[in-house]
Amino acid sequence: MALTTENKAAIVADYAQSKGDTGSPEVQVALLTARINDLTPHFKEHSKDHHSRRGLLHLVSQRRKLLDYLKGKNVERYRTLITRLGLRK
């Protein structure tokens, strides 16, 4: 299921660096993580849905690229983010 506007607004408010910040890597990674977490149960029921799985892999790849970018720019912000989101590492 897609993220609702209220859920998106809550995520943006939690991870934004300043008011109205939707483009920082933290916000983008948090939104991608929420979308990935919403898609994951779908694959438990529909294991042969390869078309959607390709989209999921694209989201995971996009999140990885943003995390790598953030790690290169500011390691402390990277570590804080992965701890808050509960990502491994």
Swiss-Prot record:
InterPro entries in UniProt: Ribosomal_uS15, Ribosomal_uS15_bac-type, uS15_NS1_RNA-bd_sf
Species of origin: Dechloromonas aromatica (strain RCB)
Subunit structure comment from the entry: Part of the 30S ribosomal subunit. Forms a bridge to the 50S subunit in the 70S ribosome, contacting the 23S rRNA.
Protein name per the record: Small ribosomal subunit protein uS15
Record-stated family: Belongs to the universal ribosomal protein uS15 family.
Keywords: Ribonucleoprotein, Ribosomal protein, RNA-binding, rRNA-binding
Summary of the function given for this chain in its UniProt record: One of the primary rRNA binding proteins, it binds directly to 16S rRNA where it helps nucleate assembly of the platform of the 30S subunit by binding and bridging several RNA helices of the 16S rRNA.
GO biological process: one example: translation
GO molecular function: rRNA binding; structural constituent of ribosome
Gene Ontology CC annotations of this record: cytosolic small ribosomal subunit
NCBIfam families: S15_bact
